[in-house]
């Protein structure tokens, strides 16, 4: 069994916010020393108890203090962002830590409705376009071409890398499981959010509908 860590950089009484982020970096270093397989950091917004708002930046810091453990986002809330920008960020991370980067994606807002609007006024529309945005992101992350009819087919995400981040779908419902199954990517159920409710149904749906992909044939 491979054990991994999810860190949220939670706030603590009397501890400066900046220190909680530095503590997260040190926790990742310690986790690697103990032999843990993955270290993922979360994305939450406008939450007084959580200082982990920018996983890609925290991952970059951790990448320079570690050498083996896989580093990931848990996750990037895609409706807030342009898929191309996310792809570029994670290709930079892949350049810094080749073969160690996991791009965990989520559809949830990671905060309240007003905060979602502040991050992206079109977040609701982008949430409805989630599958197509995942498709575009996967192409840009992997370096595969977009369909010939795509308006952005000439755009390439940089920097060039010899390896690509591993894309994961995160979720707490059947929806995320179905999207992950459709695209043939790993799925991670947020058991700690739901107390396990819905996990068996989501995982069964995922396994029964999984479409093998080149990177994950089974």
Give short role names for the model-derived ranges:
Residues 1-69:
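N-terminal beta1-alpha1-beta2 module of alpha/beta enzyme domains
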Residues 45-53, 79-84, 194-199:
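Acidic-and-aromatic substrate-binding clefts and catalytic sites of carbohydrate-active enzymes
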Residues 175-196, 202:
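A conserved active-site cap/scaffold subdomain adjacent to cofactor or substrate pockets
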Residues 2-17, 79-145, 187, 195:
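Flexible, glycine-rich active-site loops centered on histidine and acidic residues
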Residues 24-29, 56-60, 87-91, 131-138, ...:
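Generic structural signal for well-ordered alpha-helices
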Residues 32-33, 59-68, 94-101, 179-182, ...:
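Acidic (Asp/Glu)-rich catalytic clusters
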């Amino acid at each position: 069994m491979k054990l991994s860590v999810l860190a949220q950089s939670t706030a603590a009484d009397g501890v400066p916010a900046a220190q909680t982020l530095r503590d997260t970096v040190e926790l990742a270093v310690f986790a690697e020393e103990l032999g843990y397989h993955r270290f993922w950091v979360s994305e939450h917004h406008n939450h007084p108890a959580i200082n982990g708002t920018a996983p890609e930046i925290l991952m970059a810091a951790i990448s320079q203090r570690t050498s083996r453990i896989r580093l990931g986002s848990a996750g990037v809330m895609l409706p807030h962002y342009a898929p191309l920008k996310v792809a570029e960020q994670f290709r930079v991370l892949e350049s810094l830590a080749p073969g160690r980067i996991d791009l965990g994606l989520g559809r949830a807002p990671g905060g309240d409705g007003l905060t979602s609007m502040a991050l992206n006024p079109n977040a609701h529309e982008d949430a409805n376009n989630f599958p197509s945005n995942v498709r575009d992101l996967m192409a840009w992350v992997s370096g595969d071409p977009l369909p010939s009819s795509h308006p952005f087919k000439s755009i390439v995400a940089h920097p060039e890398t010899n390896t690509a981040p591993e894309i994961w779908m995160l979720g707490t419902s059947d929806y995320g499981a179905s999207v992950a199954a459709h695209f043939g990517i790993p799925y991670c159920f947020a058991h700690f959010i739901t107390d396990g409710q819905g996990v068996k149904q989501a995982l069964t749906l995922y396994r029964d509908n999984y479409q093998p992909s080149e990177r994950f044939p089974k």
